[in-house]
Amino acid sequence: MTGGVDVTERTIPAPKEIDFGTEMIRGFAFDNVLHSETEGDIHFGLYVPENYDGHKSYALFVTLPGYEGLYFQGVGVNIRSEDYGTEAKEYNDEMLIVAPQLNDWREPSARQTVALTRYFLEHYNIDPDKVYLNGYSGGGETGSLVMEYAPELYTAFLHCSSQWDGDLKPLIEAETPVYMATGENDSYYGSSSVRETYDELVRLYREKGLTDDQISELVVLDLKDQAWFDERDIKDQHGGGWYFAHEEDIMNWLFGEHE
């Protein structure tokens, strides 16, 4: 695994709008704060590969936490309690990973996510064709709103153990690929929201003239039954959504090739 570095010691000029933290948690620097003129203070963790020097374009992964990872729960608790950010290192050693600690799962946090993503695209050497987003639980709700506000910024979105809150029309226009993974009987959300979202996305893409093969590249619904959770000794289908970070087929989809 590629080790992280303390970004405060880098030779890369630090953006004036960011106050970098000094605490290292699982390879991520905390508590960084982007001071946005429009969206306020945005707290986040940051992983920078040791070999990043700003000369070569790198991928960017933004991982949105569930309720237990929000900022009021404590600095860095998102990276302590969820593995999406730490596991992502295994899939691309040339990728910056941003782990926002937002204040809720609603519109303000979605706007902050977009602002943070745009900031990294504008101030770091990021490949715009390799910008990935995931959201677990409440973070999935936030991510679905991000897909309403600025889907064109992202290469693919992994939506885990959540429900869909965003308007689908901008997503259809942008054709950003979406993978929705959840338990058939998720104890918090159920699965009706993602089922209905999947059906509506398929319908809208067909109306747009896309073939079923094309649609299958843009929308994936992955419903896990209780047997899947039992095999992994996971009792609760909602809480067990953290384990999707350890499923290679799911993570390979996110970081794979998307036309």
Task: Annotate each language-model stretch with its function.
Residues 1-58, 141, 209-216:
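A domain-start/cap signature at the N-terminus of enzymes
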Residues 51-56, 105-137:
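Gly/Ser-rich "nucleophile elbow"/oxyanion-hole loop immediately N-terminal to the catalytic nucleophile
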Residues 56-58, 71-77, 109-111, 145-146, ...:
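Short, solvent-exposed loop/turn and secondary-structure capping segments
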Residues 58-114:
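Active-site machinery of serine-nucleophile hydrolases
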Residues 66-70, 102-107, 137-141, 162-166, ...:
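Solvent-exposed loop/turn segments at secondary-structure junctions
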Residues 93, 172-178:
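Short, proline-enriched alpha-helix->beta-strand connector loops that line the catalytic pocket
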Residues 123, 129-172:
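Primarily recognizes the serine-hydrolase "nucleophile elbow" in alpha/beta-hydrolase
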Residues 168, 179-181, 185-189, 195, ...:
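C-terminal catalytic histidine-bearing segment of alpha/beta-hydrolase fold enzymes
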